[in-house]
Amino acid sequence: MQTTYRKLAKNKKIALVAHDHCKQDLIQWCQTNRTLLQPHILYATGTTGNLIHQETNLEIKNLLSGPMGGDQQLGGLIAEGKIDLLIFFWDPMNAVPHDPDVKALMRIATVWNIPVAMNIATADFLISSPAFQQETEIRIPDYQGYLKERLK
């Protein structure tokens, strides 16, 4: 597949997601990094977003809770180029009923080549990267080229 580039603005659109056993870790991470997160546009699945807002007072655009379709909503936003970065603290020790949705979310984040952090260490690396604080580009699939090729 051919590729093209997409600009990520200085103020990123960041998705925040956490499984139940990881919510407190994500809330604490957001609290620790509140100043760095504040200028960005933050999205979250329902329960996680409400808890983060309550504890940090960060403005969050809440979607549905993950099991109710929030993971799929995020996947749609990623495919539309409306999410630049995904912070997803997931619990590798416990299966969740919506595991297929989680797998689909991770797949679509990989297809569209957005940075993804699945643990605190990686989230710390992302947020401390110079690219986090400035405009940058990522390589993405050339969907128009893909479509043109398929419609020949």
Swiss-Prot record:
UniProt entry keywords in alphabetical sequence: Lyase
Q: Which domain of life is it from?
A: Bacteria
| Keyword Lyase applies | yes
Q: Which SMART domains match?
A: MGS
Q: Could you tell me the EC number(s) of this protein?
A: 4.2.3.3
| EC class name | lyase
Keyword Flavoprotein on this protein? no
Please give one Gene Ontology molecular function term for this protein.
Answer: methylglyoxal synthase activity
Q: Which Gene3D superfamilies match?
A: Methylglyoxal synthase-like domain (3.40.50.1380)
Instruction: Cite the binding residues for substrate.
Output: 19, 23, 45-48, 65-66, 98
- Tell me the ranges covered by the MGS-like domain, including all copies: 6-152
Q: Which GO terms describe its biological process?
A: methylglyoxal biosynthetic process
InterPro entries named in the record: Methylgl_synth, Methylglyoxal_synth_AS, MGS-like_dom, MGS-like_dom_sf
What GO terms fall under cellular component here?
cytosol
Reaction(s) catalysed by this chain's protein: dihydroxyacetone phosphate = methylglyoxal + phosphate
Q: What does this protein do?
A: Catalyzes the formation of methylglyoxal from dihydroxyacetone phosphate.
User: Its family?
Assistant: Belongs to the methylglyoxal synthase family.
HAMAP family named among the record's database cross-references: Methylglyoxal_synth
The protein, known as: Methylglyoxal synthase
**Source organism lineage?**
Bacteria, Pseudomonadati, Pseudomonadota, Gammaproteobacteria, Pasteurellales
